Amino acid sequence: MNKPSLPKQFALDIGHTPKPSLNNFLAGENLALHSALLALVKSWELNTPREANENALNQRWIYWWGPEGSGRTHLLSAIGDAAQELGLEHFPLTPNEPISWVRLEEKITTLCASDTPSVITVDDVDRLDERLVAALFRILNAIQGSKAVHIFMAGNAAPG
């Protein structure tokens, strides 16, 4: 006896976590930050520098904060990935990987001399030890005069 075949059942992929991007970030109360990051990526795509009068640091230094789960790391990953997709150099820095800080400091002079944008992301700024705080200070001083190095930092508290 032939039984009618059951339709093929597809697995529900509930374990898949999408890659962080600016397009899949739920901005909520962070709409201004999200919009600024989208505009910045658009300027990289069009290869048009931001207007110097937009703000003193030409939107090259941005720090955001919020509690665990607020999207800080998502946005840092998204901006870094967006830069890499456009062929720009990205240097992700975290408290857990001090060697990445050393590698960046070795390249910082060359980056600062270039007109090609590059991106530095620093996650968990509040967890940096004294050595990494000193490294961040050196990096910030080095890139201050640069026109193309962007640094995005995030932590759990407002700067104080």
PLM region descriptions:
Residues F25, L33, W64, L76, ...:
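Conserved RecA-like P-loop NTPase ATPase core
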Residues M1-E51:
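A short, basic N-terminal segment
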Residues G160:
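Short, glycine/polar-rich helix-capping loops at beta-to-alpha or helix-loop-helix junctions
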Residues A82, R138-A142:
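Conserved helical "switch/dimer-interface" subregion of ABC/ABC-like ATPase nucleotide-binding domains
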